[in-house]
Amino acid sequence: MPAFFVTGTDTEIGKTTIAAGLLHAARSAGLSTAAAKPVASGCEATAQGLRNGDALALLGECSLALAYEQVNPLAFEPAIAPHLAAREAGVELSAARLHDAVREVLALRADFTLVEGAGGWRVPLQGRENLSDLARLLGLPVVLVVGVRLGCINHALLSAEAILGDGLALAGWVANIVDPATSRLEENLATLAERLPAPCLGRVPRLADAGPAAVAAHLDLRPLGIGL
């Protein structure tokens, strides 16, 4: 069943917003959905344990019955880089450990599954490992969320180069307009479309309501080979 790894050109550029929108689009088409965000920092302490807003957003768009811990097996309270949070907590943060956790979700064989990373492509784990090593172990095609603002072309092209250099397929990309005041916006988008070696799955404007349904209206799953 189709599964994809979602990464972004940076942190705070709307990876989860886009991932939840993609899941919603799949659900609306009658597909079963599942998701994983294997590591998250900036979590809130609740009576049920640490909870991350991004992981909860993904869980809300999963049609399969998943426990929170299946979606987000490693949660850390400090809003810092995951490898620093794990080090402070004395927790192993290896690509192999995350891989084993994600495989449990993939084994459910939903019609459409997303695995969302943290930050960008080269976010450190432990030792010399990066989150990209998890993506390589999983072998999933990648969806790149481009936070459209000044500097995004360089970030997007470098990210795409790294993804392909790691031997993974770039299945598609999404233009998420995080700064509508970006100078020469249309020209920037045209350059991205010309230079990125993958189809664009949609252009998401800055929305007053950035809920999954509103975002899904601007996305197209067909370039991913998903029949709708």
Curated annotation (Swiss-Prot):
Cofactor list: Mg(2+)
GO MF terms, alphabetically ordered: ATP binding; dethiobiotin synthase activity; magnesium ion binding
UniProt-annotated binding residues for substrate: 41
Binding positions (ATP): 12-17, 54, 116-119, 205-207
Its EC number(s): 6.3.3.3
Primary location recorded for the protein, binned into one broad class: cytoplasm
Reactions the enzyme catalyzes: (7R,8S)-7,8-diammoniononanoate + CO2 + ATP = (4R,5S)-dethiobiotin + ADP + phosphate + 3 H(+)
One BP term from GO: biotin biosynthetic process
Residues at the active site: 37
InterPro entries for the chain: DTB_synth_BioD (IPR004472), P-loop_NTPase (IPR027417)
Binding locations of Mg(2+): 16, 54, 116
Keywords from the named record: ATP-binding, Biotin biosynthesis, Cytoplasm, Ligase, Magnesium, Metal-binding, Nucleotide-binding
Entry-linked Pfam families: AAA_26
Pathway: Cofactor biosynthesis; biotin biosynthesis; biotin from 7,8-diaminononanoate: step 1/2
Protein family membership: Belongs to the dethiobiotin synthetase family.
Protein purpose: Catalyzes a mechanistically unusual reaction, the ATP-dependent insertion of CO2 between the N7 and N8 nitrogen atoms of 7,8-diaminopelargonic acid (DAPA, also called 7,8-diammoniononanoate) to form a ureido ring.
Assembly and oligomerization: Homodimer.
Protein name: ATP-dependent dethiobiotin synthetase BioD
Gene: bioD
